Amino acid sequence: MLRLFRRSLRSPLHPPPQRGPRPIRRWQAFLLIPLFLLVLPPAGISRAASDGNREAEIALGHLIAMKGNGFAGSTACAECHRINGGGMPSVGIPRIAGQTATYIYREIRGVQKGTRFSPFMSRVVRNFSKSDIRAVALYYSTVRTPKLHDPSEFDPSLQPLGRRIARRGLWDRNIPACILCHGEDGRGIPPNFPYIAGQSKTYLMQQIKSFAVVDRKDDPEGLMRGIASKLKNREIKAVAQYFASLTPPDYGKIPEQNSPKRLRLIPENLNGKEVNHP
């Protein structure tokens, strides 16, 4: 009887139990970590990339950039960064056109959390939701704007020193080359390391000094804080001037389907208005 019962368990109606997957050993798990990081979507914008509403989010970002998000005290991003993302070089407001959405998202969140010191920006973005930030970040990441005029004083004698710090570093004082993180000619290493080529001298000097005195502390492992604190004033001026003299990168033309109303935003439009191109 017992033999018949066991035979019935091996019948098609009772297939034998399947073996489960073999457990992953610890050393195998460590090998999978780099692969996991490569395929992991960038924080903050993964939803935007996957839900099929990218065009709508960019259009929302364009609206917030022009008018704010509707909360009391909310100011349009274009008031300072301009609708073309060119910023205001004369007063050190950075260009954000063409920066990666991941980086812009991270920096706005940093202002909200207090890891990036900016009293004015903190008032502007304090009521921004993550969806608002995602939309604005996506919008400005698609904008392409030629370099604006930087009225800062240019000292030709500083250029060789700035180039040396940028490209070779000052290893005798444990100061690495800037291009190791910010890319060849300051073009950035997307998505996490921003381009700094073509930023204004005033802005770059402000940020290096902000890292040096730990007003800004959103750098991974305190890397920029450690570097900035070792630079002398003349070296800060030199490296800021060098990168300000370079041309900002263009990561490609705006895909038509991602550009609301197919706008081309040009630096002459500093009054927050757009110009349609044919």
Name each model-derived stretch.
Residues 1-25:
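N-terminal secretory signal peptides that target proteins for export/translocation
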Residues 29-40:
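Bacterial N-terminal signal peptides
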Residues 46-73, 142-171, 269-278:
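Electrostatic cytochrome c docking/interface patches
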Residues 62-78, 101, 167-179, 194-206, ...:
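Sequence context surrounding c-type heme c attachment/ligation sites in exported
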Residues 74-83, 136, 175-185, 239:
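The canonical Cys-X-X-Cys-His
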